[in-house]
Each structure stands twice: as structure tokens, then as C-alpha cells.
Amino acid sequence: TIVYFLSNQVYAWHKILLVLTILILAPVFIFASRQPVPSLKTLRFDRPPLVTLSGTLEYIEETQVVWEIPISPKAILFIAHGCHGRASFFWDKSPTCAECSGLPEERTITLNALAKGYVVIAISSTRECWSLSNDRTKVLSILSGWIRDKGLEALPVVALGASSGGSFVSALAREYKFKAIVVMISEGSFHKMEIDENYPSTLFVHMVKDERRATLIKNAMDKLRSKGIETHEVKCYESIVTPDYFTKIPGLDSETSHQIQKIFKENGVLDEDNLMTMDGRAMNWMTPLKKK
């Protein structure tokens, strides 16, 4: 899949959403429904998935900022992490980012974005979760200033936010002229804010078994469409945790992945179909691994 651009550097909306959908379709390691989604092995990478990411860490306005610019950049992706996340989770530890840790799903987003020609910049929230009062002014300043300093003003900017970051991005988009946004695992802030026809195209990514959130997202989509805003959704289903599932983690070989999967099955983390028995956030799934 490639990023399509018009000669005037403005995306066609449906093409933006198509590319962004691919960026966020990493396996969802969480309890959802009985229909599996593609694993990482079925996604096409433009370079090996275990390539080392080399983000550059800076502290701008006393805020952690990590970024990476590919050769011949075509667009800019701003990432807002979820609660308890950090910008440094999206890149591998390297000489230019000693604080980076490269979490598997986060680095997959960065990897795919860079491979598609996106400049990637992530900013950490002031506290554990995002809030407009703490982060709005600072992020607007950092993002605008960084893009200007790097001479990237001609590139279109899109945003991806997860959970708390999704709510934050949806609110920030009223002021910052994103070309499109992705709101993951969140209904956004649409229930408490007004929008007009200039609001960017919006893609919601959510888990089908979270019925309450699905209803809220439907309401948000209806509101956006009533203003003529293009909006779509990606429904995430549970992943089958195969014996090789964990080999996508850099440095983790097939034998270790098989052992982890076996321990999970023996301790009730996975059922007979290799599906998680409950929401991973609600189970102490590290305990059986520590015993070994």
C-alpha cells in the first residue's frame, strides 16, 4: 500500500483513511469477539519488521518529544499515546533515544508509518493521561514550532490518538488543521464539543465486544456526518495467539514464543482455541511467566 498525494500536497480523504487504517491494524491483544483479525504476518511491510527504529529524543518546553524523518517524507503523523504511555514507547532504544523502549504494538505503528513515507512525531502528556487544560497549549506550540524548525510546513499533517490520546486529538483537531485523524479505543470528545464542516475526516478504531463504546462511537459518527464530515470505523476482533505470535517482539525467538504461549494455555490465559479468556487489562497474566 502506498501513500497517495495530489500535486498540491493535499490528500483525497478516502485515500488518507485507507492508509491510516493500515497503520493501526496491528493485532489487538485484547478480549473481543470470535472473528480473528489479520496477524502481523499477514500485513505487508516495505522493510523487515525487526528493523531498528532510530528516533531522536528532545525535551521541548520540558516535554518529552521523539521524532524520526524518513527519506523523501510525504506527510507528518502526530501520535498521542494512551494513559500511562510515553512518546518513547514508539521507538527502539538507540544512541539518539536512550529513554526509548520500543513496545511491540507501538513500534509497529511507527515502523509502518515510516515505511509509507510519514514523518513521525510523538509527544508525551504532562500527566498519566491527556487533558486539554494541561496539554493543549503546549502541544499546539511544540507541534507547530517543530514542523517549522524542520522546514516541513508544506507537508500535510494527520494525527493518531489512542484512548485518552484519542479524546485529546479529537478536541485538538478543532484548532489544529489536521488533514485527517484516527481515534483509537475512544469515542473522542464529540459529545461535549461543537464542530463545523471544517473538521477533519475521522476514522474510529474500536473493539467490537466493547458494546458501550461502540454505541458512543456511533453517536459521534452520526454527529460528524450531520456536518458533512467523512467518517468511518474499523472494528477490531480478537487475535488468535499462535505459538509464534510473540516473535514480532524484537529479540524474542520462536522457541521462547512457543514457551510463552504454552504457559498461557496451561494457566488459563488462553482457551482451547488460543483466544484470550478475558480482557488482558483485567488479568494478571505476567504471574505465570514469572513462576517459570
How should each PLM-predicted stretch be described?
Residues 73-76, 116-120, 153-156, 176-181, ...:
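Loop/turn elements at helix/coil->beta-strand transitions in domains of secreted/extracellular proteins
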Residues 88-92, 132-134, 171-172, 193-195, ...:
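Short, solvent-exposed loop/turn and secondary-structure capping segments
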Residues 5-8, 15-16, 26-76, 171, ...:
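A domain-start/cap signature at the N-terminus of enzymes
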Residues 110, 114-129:
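Conserved alpha/beta-hydrolase
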Residues 179-277:
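The feature captures the conserved acid-bearing segment of alpha/beta-hydrolase catalytic domains
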Residues 127-152, 157:
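Alpha/beta-hydrolase active-site loop
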Residues 71-112:
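Short, surface-exposed "cap/lid" segments of acyl-processing enzymes
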Residues 160-169:
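Gly/Ala-rich beta-loop-alpha elbow adjacent to hydrolase catalytic centers
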